[in-house]
Amino acid sequence: MTHLSPEAFAIIEGRHADPFRYLGQHNVDGQTIVRAFLPEASRVEVVGEHGEVAPLARIHDAGLFTGTMSSMQRYRLRATFGDSVTDLEDPYRFLPILGDFDLHLLGEGNHERLYDKLGAHPMVIDGVDGVGFVVLAPNARRVSVVGDFNFWNARRHPMRVRGNGYWELFIPRARAGDHYKFDIIGPQGEHLPLKSDPMAFAAEMRPKTASIVVDETRLPRPRPAPHDINKLNKPVSIYEVHLGSWRRKDNNQWLTYRELAEQLPAYARDMGFTHIEFLPINEHPFDGSWGYQPTGLYAPTSRFGSPEDFCALVDACHREGLAVWLDWVPGHFPDDPHGLGHFDGTALYEHANPMQGRHLDWGTLIYNYGRTEVANFLRSNALFWLERYGIDGLRVDAVASMLYLDYSRPSGGWIPNKYGGRENLEAIEFLRRTNIDVFGHFPQATTAAEESTAWPQVSRPVDTGGLGFGYKWNMGWMHDTLRYVSKDPIHRKYHHGEILFGLHYAFSENFILPLSHDEVVHGKRSILGRMPGDDWQRFANLRAYYSFMFGHPGKKLLFMGCELAQEREWNHDTSLDWHLLGDARYAGIQALIRDLNHLYRNQPALHERDCDPEGFEWLITDDADRNVFAWVRKGFDERAHCVVVVNFSPNVYYNYRVRAPLGGTWREVFNSDSSHYGGSNVGNVGQVHASEDQHLNLILPPMAAVFLVPEA
C-alpha cells in the first residue's frame, strides 16, 4: 500500500475541507496527476478527450485511486463496479459555479435572486448535464452533498468552500427528482444531523425530510391576476383558506393542489371574493402548526402535490379573476434537527443568545435580521414567490413579535437595542427593505402586516418613516366589535363606544378588517358561537355583524367556514361542515356573504375610499339606547353614496329618521333581515323618499342592517 499524505486520509475519512485541492486533475512537478475517490469501484481508468486511456492505481482499499495522463485535458472516469463498467464524469474537474460578482453580492447581502444561485439547480457545464449545489455554512469544517446519486455516502461528494462561507459542487448525472441533504461537520469537528437544503424548491412528505431537486426555471408561469386588483381604490375581499381542511375527500384525505384548482377558485369567485389568501404553504414538519413553523421557505408543501401542481392552483385562481396572497412567516422557524437551527454547528440563522433567539410562547427560533446573509435569504424568498409562482401579495405573520425585543418576555428576559430601547432595529430595517424590494420589483403586488400593537405608520411609505406595507390588519376593530356583538343586546348600550372607537383611527393605516383563523380556535368559539340569545337571535346577530363589517371602511377578510356559519371551532384535521348548507339557516348566511361581496364590489362608495377619511361620515352615533348606528360611505363620484344603518337590538323601529346626504329617492339595495337570508322580511319595500328637510324615514328591521343608495 502506497504511503499516503494527510490530505489523502482526510479524503478517505470524509473530513477534507477543500477536496478540489487533492481530487481531480493537477499538475505536480510537470506531471499531470489524476486522483479519484470511488469507494464502490474495484478498478478505475481515466479517459482523455482525445481517446487516451490510462489506468489509475488503487492506493487505498477505501477506494482512493491515482494515476497520470500525458497532459492537462478534459477527461472522464471509467469505473468497474462488480461486473459492470461505467463511464463517469468527475465532479472535481469542473470550474466553480459561483462567479466573482455573485460572491460580491452575497458578501454584501444584496443578492436579490438567491434562488437563481443557491440550492440545487439542474445545469449543463462543459456539455455535461448535472446539478449544481450551493449552500451557506461559514463555520463548517466540511460540507458534503448526500443523496440518491451517491448512496447517501458523505465521503463521496465533499464540497468546496468559496468566499463568505458558501459551499458548492457540481454533480454530473444528478437530475431533477433526486433526493438530497447536506452532511455537515461543525466547527468543533462534530457531525451534525443531516440538514435539508434551506433553498430547496421541493421536499419529501413528512415525516421524511429530504430535499428534492427541482428545475424551477421550467415551472409553468401562471397567467397574471387582473390589473390593479390590490390597489386601495379597488374592492379587496379576501377568503382566507387552509388548504388541508377547506374540503376533504370521503376518506378524510386532503384534496391535491389540482383537485383544489378544480373547486376552490370557482367557489370563491361565485361567492364574490376578490382574493384568496392561503395559510402558509411552505414546507413544514408539523400539521398542527398550520404552516406557521416552516422548514422549507422556498418549497410548496408536498402534502398536496408538486410545485407544478401548485402553479396550476395559482393559475386557476387567476383564471377566475382572483388574486392570490400567501401567509409568509419571516419571524421565526422551528428547531427541528433537519432544519435551519444550528445549521453549521453554530447559530447561523438564529441569535445565539436565547433571550434574542428563542420565542418563549412558541418554542421556535428567531431569525437574526442583523446578519446580512439571513436578511438576504428572507428578502429573496419574498421575491421568489412573486416571480416564480405569480403570487400577488404576502401577508406577513406576527409582525409585532418581530418589532419588539421584549415581545412576550418577562422583565429582565430580553436584551435592549443599542439605544437601550425595546425596538428591534434590525427587524425594522429588514421589513422596510423587504417592502421596498417587493414594490420596486413587482408594482402590482402588495404586502399586508398582521401587527397587533399601535406601532405607527405600518402601511405608510418608508421614505416618510413608515414600514412600507401595503395594508395592515385592524386587530383593534376585530377585538372591539366581536366583544360588542357577544354582549346581550340589553347591555350593548353600555358598550356603544366599542363600535365608535374604531373610527377614531380607521384611516391612520390602510386597514384590512380580519375575521381570521385565529378567531375561531383555542376556545374562542366560532363567530356564530359568540352570538348571544336564542337560535333566531344568534343568526340575526351574525347577519347584522357581517353586514356591519362590509359597510365599515376597510378591506375585508373572512376565514373559510365563516361564510357557512360554522357552529364548531375550526379543526385543521377535518373538512369544513359543508353539510350545514342543507339547513336554510346556514344556507342563508352563505347567501348573505355572497350578496355582501357582490354589493361591496359593485357599489364604488363601499370600496373606492376604504382608506380615505373623505369617504366616510357618521350620521348617527348617539343612539346607544336603541343600539343603532348610521353612516354614509362616499365614492369619488358625487352621487356615489351609500347609507348604512345597523340596528343591533331585537326591536323593530318605525319612522326612524336618518339624515340623507342627497335628496330624492333612495333604493334599499340590501337588507340583512330578508327572508332570503333567514330573516323576518321587515324592510322599506325597496325604496325611501327623502323628506323636504332631507331625511329618510326608515323602518329598521330587528338585529339587521340596511344599505341605501340614491336613485340614479
From Swiss-Prot:
A GO term for molecular function: cation binding
Alphabetically ordered keywords of this record: Carbohydrate metabolism, Glycogen biosynthesis, Glycogen metabolism, Glycosyltransferase, Transferase
Enzyme Commission number: 2.4.1.18
Top-rank lineage group of the source organism: Bacteria
Reaction catalysed by this enzyme: Transfers a segment of a (1->4)-alpha-D-glucan chain to a primary hydroxy group in a similar glucan chain
One BP annotation, GO: glycogen biosynthetic process
Pfam families named in the record: Alpha-amylase (PF00128), Alpha-amylase_C (PF02806), CBM_48 (PF02922), GlgB_N (PF22019)
This protein's GO CC annotations: cytosol
InterPro entries documented for this protein: A-amylase/branching_C, Branching_enzy, GlgB, GlgB_N, GlgB_N_E_set_prok, Glyco_hydro_13_cat_dom, Glyco_hydro_13_N, Glyco_hydro_b
CDD domains: AmyAc_Glg_BE, E_set_GBE_prok_N
Residues the record marks as active site: 397 (nucleophile), 450 (proton donor)
Recorded metabolic or biological pathway in which this protein acts: Glycan biosynthesis; glycogen biosynthesis
Quaternary structure annotation from Swiss-Prot or TrEMBL: Monomer.
Family, as annotated: Belongs to the glycosyl hydrolase 13 family. GlgB subfamily.
Physiological role: Catalyzes the formation of the alpha-1,6-glucosidic linkages in glycogen by scission of a 1,4-alpha-linked oligosaccharide from growing alpha-1,4-glucan chains and the subsequent attachment of the oligosaccharide to the alpha-1,6 position.
Protein name, as recorded: 1,4-alpha-glucan branching enzyme GlgB
Organism: Bradyrhizobium sp. (strain ORS 278)
